[in-house]
Amino acid sequence: MLVVFVATWSDLGLCKKRPKPGGWNTGGSRYPGQGSPGGNRYPPQGGGGWGQPHGGGWGQPHGGGWGQPHGGGWGQPHGGGWGQGGGTHNQWHKPSKPKTSMKHMAGAAAAGAVVGGLGGYMLGSAMSRPLIHFGNDYEDRYYRENMYRYPNQVYYRPVDQYSNQNNFVHDCVNITIKQHTVTTTTKGENFTETDVKMMERVVEQMCITQYEKESQAYYQRGSSMVLFSSPPVILLISFLIFLIVG
């Protein structure tokens, strides 16, 4: 009985050691592409499948499919299709630059800049047209209906060129109405006496506002100059510069 058990156990051990023919990872069919030269490999070499270096499928460097560098399909650098180096439509059409209109140029001009051809006058920033009552319903209604035709910016010179507010406002009103009238008349629109009367009132209010704004800025600049020109401040600044440089 013991001899039979030993013989059976030895026979089972020899069966496990014997190589099995065929099957995965044997000499017949291997993955990926290993084993005998005649086996079936994936990916196959020298064939014509997808992604191969010498085939004719999609994306191959020497094939003729879409997107290949030497093919003839769309978007290829040496092909003859649309957008290719050898094609007739190899560049996008560049859009023409938009023309800059006078309206855009005027809108881009900074408020307070010196206006050329007006002898040193500056153009103030845009304002909301004031609500003015003229004493009767007709003129009040006329103003509300036509206020968009009147100026919303004024021309002025620096406040330090005038001795008082009245002179500033008088000059501001005259030059603003003159410029606005000339510009509007050139466009083929005329003003009536009522228009001129209302423009004088509107522009006068805006010129007063502009004077107050410019006067405040002028005095602030003057105060800053006086502050920094005082001897204690100059001494302090000099000491700080000495500490930084030294």
Curated annotation (Swiss-Prot):
Domain of life per record: Eukaryota
Keywords, ordered alphabetically: Amyloid, Cell membrane, Copper, Disulfide bond, Glycoprotein, Golgi apparatus, GPI-anchor, Lipoprotein, Membrane, Metal-binding, Prion, Repeat, Signal, Zinc
Sequence repeat ranges per the UniProt record: 44-52, 53-60, 61-68, 69-76, 77-84
Organism annotation: Erythrocebus patas (Red guenon)
Topological relation to the membrane, as annotated: Lipid-anchor; GPI-anchor
Protein name: Major prion protein
Binding site for Cu(2+) 2: H62, G63, G64
A matching Pfam family: Prion_octapep
GO cellular component, one term: plasma membrane
Lineage: Eukaryota, Metazoa, Chordata, Craniata, Vertebrata
Signal sequence bounds: 1-15
Gene (name only): PRNP
Region (Disordered): 18-100
Involvement in disorder: PrP is found in high quantity in the brain of humans and animals infected with the degenerative neurological diseases kuru, Creutzfeldt-Jakob disease (CJD), Gerstmann-Straussler syndrome (GSS), scrapie, bovine spongiform encephalopathy (BSE), transmissible mink encephalopathy (TME), etc.
Spans annotated as Interaction with GRB2, ERI3 and SYN1: 16-223
